[in-house]
Each structure stands twice: as structure tokens, then as C-alpha cells.
Amino acid sequence: DLHSFPTRRSSDLHIARNAGAAKATGDWLLFVDADSELNPGLLADILRLIEDGKSVGCGSTLHMEGLPWWGNWMFQLWKGASILFRWAAGALVVCRSDAFRDVGGFNQELYAADEIRLSEDLKQWGRQRGLQFIILRTHPLETSARKVMLYSGREIAAQILRVILHPRRTLQDKKQLSVWYDGRR
């Protein structure tokens, strides 16, 4: 069964995801952003991963149309880090439901990058059981470039710099995460 759990405020996303997972009855969970398109090739890749029984979960590379040059540059940096460190992007996280519950789900204290923390937790859980967490690359998830179009390169770079210099303080305070929470739509 497929269930959707809408939320009133974007700051509730991690709460909505955890609430949805708590109500889910399946062996696997799939979290996908509303502004993303799960294409048939990617869905087939996910189903193969589930059937092979060798993975605790996965994320996917992303594809965004219409990025400015600086947005494409930042996007390629993220893509490289995602593949290298096996970090799922928040737009798509797939995992075993028992693993999700055992690691505590999405971190309730983080307003951004909770998918990275979850990726790390799932990798550790999987290692203990001989399972891997992978990033699928053959059929990227189509997702929106909306945030890149709403903010200047300077604003996005400043946001990234705040996260790098003061990660805990920034990621735990919505006021420090203007690109996600200042209300621009």
C-alpha cells in the first residue's frame, strides 16, 4: 500500500516522515519529495535492490533542469559527495523498515541534513549485518530546481558556509536555515 502523509509546514518534514514510517506496515520505506518524479527506470532499480537482499537501503543521484552555471557547479559537488560518502539526498531515501526503526528514523533535532545523518546510521546498521547502503546512479531522480531559482548564488553559498562553519548550531535552528525556512516559494 502507498500512503501519503502531508504536513502543514516545511519545518515538520522530519516529523511527518517519522510519523508516516510509524504507521507503515511494509518491510521497506520509500520517502520521496513531492516536487520529485520517480521514473520507471529508477523504480525498477529500487525493486531490484530490494529483491537482491544485499542492501539496507539506497538513495539516488538527482537530475535538475535549468540550473545556472553556479548552481550546476554546486550540484555536481553534491553529486560527487553523495556518491563518495553514500549519502542519500533528502529528495529520495529508501530503506528497510526494521533498520529505520532501529536507528531512530530521521533525527528530530535537525531541520536540514537529516537525510545525511540517516544515511550514516543506516550504513552502520547495515555493516553489522553484512548489508550495504548504496546510491543508485543509472536513472537519476528528476527533482525541482526551485530553490536554486529562488535564491542567488551568494545566498546559497552563504547558507552552505554557515553549515560548514557551525554545523550543529545551524542545522538545529530554523532561523539559521533561511534557504529552507524563510518562506520564499
Regions found by a protein language model. Give the residues of each.
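A recurrent flexible, glycine/aromatic-enriched loop bordering the glycosyltransferase active site
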Residues: 2, 57, 61-66, 78-98
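Short, small-residue-biased leader/transition segments that mark boundaries at the very start
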Residues: 3-10
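Short, conserved alpha-helix that lines the donor NDP-sugar binding/gating region
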Residues: 13-22
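Short aromatic/hydrophobic "clamp" motif used to bind/position activated sugar donors
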Residues: 29
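The conserved acidic donor/metal-binding loop of glycosyltransferases
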Residues: 33-37
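Conserved donor NDP-sugar-binding/catalytic core segment of glycosyltransferases
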Residues: 40-70
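A short, conserved alpha-helix in the catalytic core of glycosyltransferases
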Residues: 99-104, 109-130
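Hydrophobic helical membrane-anchoring modules
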Residues: 124-185
